[in-house]
């Protein structure tokens, strides 16, 4: 939200400068009264008072307290014991992950059935264009389509 208020304040300041410099350029807008300018200046000052300074220096003590609070919030996490670097024979075969009980024929049959279902799905039919059928016909005639190929004679 700080950048939005900075942009707003900058825009208001720009408008104030434009109003001050425009006195002779356009007679319709050049007749701004001093009361209007003072109201605008008060509004701008009020906005600047509400806007926090972005260059505030935070003391290191406050930062360390915030880090301690964040560390305290993370402390209820369970401790994980370090890995010893040894692998059980069941893990080497894939049994720990639930993959060891599958035969290769079962796996290949499942993959084939999934591939057939994927290829037979109506959304996976090969489309030859990136814009649709009508644009593809126009592109094929003009040579400007996505997948249009002109054969040279």
Curated annotation (Swiss-Prot):
Is Metal-binding there in the keyword field? no
Instruction: Output one GO BP term.
Output: cGMP biosynthetic process
Tell me which positions the record assigns to the signal sequence. 1-25
Instruction: Report any Pfam family annotated for this entry.
Output: ANP
Q: Which residues carry this modification: Phosphoserine?
A: 129
**InterPro entries to which the protein is assigned, alphabetical:** Natr_peptide, Natr_peptide_CS, Natriuretic_peptide, Natriuretic_peptide_atrial
Q: Which domain of life is it from?
A: Eukaryota
Supply the PROSITE patterns for this chain. Answer: NATRIURETIC_PEPTIDE
Site Cleavage: list residues: 123-124, 130-131
Give the free-text PTM comment from the record: The precursor molecule is proteolytically cleaved by CORIN at Arg-123 to produce the atrial natriuretic peptide. Undergoes further proteolytic cleavage by unknown proteases to give rise to long-acting natriuretic peptide, vessel dilator and kaliuretic peptide. Additional processing gives rise to the auriculin and atriopeptin peptides. In the kidneys, alternative processing by an unknown protease results in the peptide urodilatin.
Alphabetically list the UniProt keywords. Cell projection, Disulfide bond, Hormone, Phosphoprotein, Secreted, Signal, Vasoactive, Vasodilator
User: Which cysteines are disulphide-bonded?
Assistant: 130-146
User: Where is the region Disordered?
Assistant: 62-104
Give me the ranges of the annotated region Important for degradation of atrial natriuretic peptide by IDE: 147-151
Family, according to the entry, reads as follows: Belongs to the natriuretic peptide family.
Query: What's the protein name?
Result: Natriuretic peptides A
Which species is the source of this protein? Felis catus
